[in-house]
């Protein structure tokens, strides 16, 4: 008798995991093509805060994989979009992905492709490249770790406006499911939200909430008014190391 065919095994299909994470050995085979990528791989830059401090553009998602290894992603919405052509309607799939480490970093990616898997994979890459820092704060006394936002912030996209309001410790995230997931991946534990407009449009609602939470770094609170010396940019400090790995033809 012939042996039975092995059963097909499926991977972990739970949401919120590392769906677009790097494979084993992919990081080792990464060859940086930018100065920032070469400095990160060489260990000269060890945190994303150094990148944010000098507003350095991130062009390679592997940089984020190295500096933020605990990222989690979640697919918020998948829908079909159509375009009218001479041959008829062309249908493609659009994916909206949120990514974050629940520790002050969050990103949003939107991508359209012919297949769902391709759209999700590309949206995860876009979300990694768009990761921004979040400034967290307190509702009342400055006891323990920051749990909320430092002040009220507002974001707008299309007709949707989302306002985030600090909440007392233990209140939780009072928001719609999509905005709540964005706050969780950003690391905000307690916050009130208020939204207006066509909030049924998930994409615009997420964009408005993402713009609002990103505004926490658009100003300085009084406790940050003290002058601090600005360090030199890593691209200037390690200029020779950054140029050494560049291929010359």
From Swiss-Prot:
Pfam families, from UniProt? Ribosomal_S5, Ribosomal_S5_C
S5 DRBM domain mapped to chain residues = 71-134
Q: Where in the cell is it found?
A: Cytoplasm
- Spell out the GO cellular component terms annotated for this protein, sorted alphabetically and separated by semicolons: cytosolic small ribosomal subunit; small-subunit processome
Q: Where does the record place Basic and acidic residues bias? A: 1-14
Q: Which UniProt keywords apply?
A: Cytoplasm, Ribonucleoprotein, Ribosomal protein
This chain's protein is named: Small ribosomal subunit protein uS5
- Which source organism does the UniProt entry give? Candida albicans (strain SC5314 / ATCC MYA-2876) (Yeast)
| The encoding gene | RPS21
């Amino acid at each position: 008798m012939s042996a039975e065919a092995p059963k097909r095994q499926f991977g972990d299909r739970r949401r919120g995991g590392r769906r677009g994470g790097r494979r084993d050995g992919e990081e080792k085979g990464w060859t940086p093509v930018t100065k920032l990528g070469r400095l990160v791989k060489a260990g000269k830059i060890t945190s994303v805060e150094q990148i944010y401090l000098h507003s350095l553009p991130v062009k390679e998602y592997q940089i984020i994989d190295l500096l933020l290894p605990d990222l989690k992603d979640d697919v918020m919405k998948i829908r079909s979009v159509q375009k009218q052509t001479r041959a008829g309607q062309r249908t493609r799939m659009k994916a909206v992905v949120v990514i974050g480490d629940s520790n002050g970093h969050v990103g949003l990616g939107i991508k359209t492709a012919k297949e769902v898997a391709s759209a999700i994979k590309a949206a995860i890459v876009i979300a990694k490249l768009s990761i921004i820092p979040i400034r967290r704060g307190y509702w009342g006394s400055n006891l323990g770790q920051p749990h909320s936002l430092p002040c009220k912030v507002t974001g707008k996209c299309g007709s949707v406006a989302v306002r985030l309001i600090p909440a007392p410790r233990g209140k939780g995230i009072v928001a719609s499911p999509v905005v709540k997931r964005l706050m969780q991946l950003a690391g905000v534990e307690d916050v009130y939200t208020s939204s207006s407009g066509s909030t049924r449009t998930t994409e615009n609602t997420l964009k408005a909430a993402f713009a609002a939470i990103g505004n926490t770094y658009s100003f300085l609170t009084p406790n940050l008014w003290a002058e601090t010396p600005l360090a030199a940019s890593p691209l200037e400090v390690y200029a020779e190391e950054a140029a050494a790995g560049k291929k010359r033809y």
